[in-house]
C-alpha cells in the first residue's frame, strides 16, 4: 500500500516554483487569517475552481482558494509529478485490488489543465438527455438543464480561453490550427469513407490572444508544461490575473479535510491541514465551492461526517460517491509511408498540438450496441522518436460515455494516506454493454486506419477502469433530493451554501472531453453562488 501515501511536501520542494504567483499567493496557511470569515472558500484550483473563483472575485466577493498541491517548477514534467502523488485502491480487472488506482488528473496549482492537451468540446444535445437510448438501472441520466442553457457560458469561456477549431459555425472560436501531416492522411481516409471530419477544438492560441502568445507547436502539452503561455490553462488564464486582485487569497499546500455542517441547512467552516506546518485550522465562510474533481470531491463530502451529517455532507440520499463514470477509451495506431521528406521533417520538427482532426460520425450509431457510439480523434504519440525514420504514425483514440451504475462508486478505505486521511477507493467495474461498444468503436478505428493505408495496426489500452482524466457523476445533479446530491446549479440539497462545480455533478458523462463543459457549469454555478449570497445578505438587513 506504499503508493497510497504520496510524497510529503518536505521531500518535494524541488518540484515547486520558487516564486509565488502574485501578491495574493503563498504556500501554507497564514495564522493571521484564523479569525477571518470569507464570503466564499473555493476548494480546488483546477478547471472548475479557477473559473468559479474568477467570476466570484469579479463580482466583488472576498474569495479564498485553497489547493493541496503547489505551483509547479516550470521544468517539472507530468511523469515526475505523477510519481509524487498518492494513488487509490482500485479493482484490477482480475477479481482483486491494486493500489495503483488514479484519483486525479494531476495534483497541483491549476490541476489537470497544466498537463491537458487543450481539447475543448461543447456537449451535443443528446448528452443532456440520453434517456431514450441509455438505461442506467433506475438512475436518472437527464441533466436538470439543456444545451441552450449552457450555450452563453460556452461562448464566454471559448473567448477567454482562446479556443480554436471545432465544427464550422459552432461557438465563439478562432481559426483552427493547421492539420498535422498525420491529420491530413486521416482526413483523406475519412472523407473517402463518407465521414465529415473537422479540426479538433483546442484551448490553444493559434494567434496571440488574451495577452498570451501563439502556439509554437513544440510539444503536445501533455507530458510537459506549455512553455509559451499559448495554452489556455487555469493558471495562465484565470489564476495569474487573480493573484494580483485585492479580494482574492490563494493558499497552496493547504488540504481540505472535512466540511463542518454546524447548522441544519448550512456548512459553517472547513477544517484544513497546512501540509507544510502539519497544523490544522478551521476556516469559516458564508459559502463553499467544492471543485476537487469527481473523485476527490466525493471523498471530501464522505469525510465530512458530524451530528447534522452523520453519513457525510450532502449524503442525505446515500448517493455521494455513487454513479462514478470515467468514460471508456482506447488508442489504435498504425504507420504509413511519409508523403515526402519535407512532410516527414515538418512532422518531426513540430510535436504539437496533440490533436488536429476529429470525427463524430459514429457518435450515435444504430449499428453500435445500444445505438450510442463514440468520438474518434487524432491523439499523437508523446514519444514519436520510437517510430521508424521513414514513416508517419497515425494514432487515434476513441472515447465513449459509460453507463452510470450505483455500484460504481468512490468509497473511503481503512488505510490512511500520508496526511492520516482515509485513502480513496475507486470501486468501478465496466458495464458489459460498454465493453461491447468499445470493441465496436475500435473496429471502426481500424477501418479508418486501413483506409489510410496503415500497416502494423496496434491497440493500446488507456487503463480507464483504474482511474481516468475524465471523472464524473459522484455528486449527481437533479431536481429531487431523494435521487440526487445537488440541484441544477450544483447546490447541495441538504446544505445549500455548498456547491459542487466539478464533473461530479454530471448525471450522464457525455461522450466528449468534459473540461469545457465542466468549466461552463462552474461559471453558471458561480452566478448562483453570488446571487445566493446577495439574497442572504439582503434578508438579514
Curated annotation (Swiss-Prot):
GO MF annotations in UniProt: flavin adenine dinucleotide binding; oxidoreductase activity, acting on the CH-OH group of donors, oxygen as acceptor
Full protein name: Paromamine 6'-oxidase
Organism in which the protein naturally occurs: Streptomyces fradiae
Alphabetized Pfam families for the sequence: GMC_oxred_C, GMC_oxred_N, NAD_binding_8
Keywords, ordered alphabetically: Antibiotic biosynthesis, FAD, Flavoprotein, Oxidoreductase
Organism placement in taxonomy: Bacteria, Bacillati, Actinomycetota, Actinomycetes, Kitasatosporales
Cofactor(s) demanded: FAD
Keyword presence, Ribosomal protein: no
Sequence similarity: Belongs to the GMC oxidoreductase family.
Role: Glucosaminyl-6'-oxidase involved in the biosynthetic pathway of neomycin by mediating FAD-dependent dehydrogenation of paromamine to 6'-dehydro-6'-oxoparomamine. Works in combination with neamine transaminase to replace the 6-hydroxy group of paromamine with an amino group. Also able to collaborate with neomycin C transaminase to replace the 6'''-hydroxy group of 6'''-hydroxyneomycin C with an amino group.
Region ranges (Disordered): 1-29
Pathway as given in its UniProt record: Antibiotic biosynthesis; neomycin biosynthesis
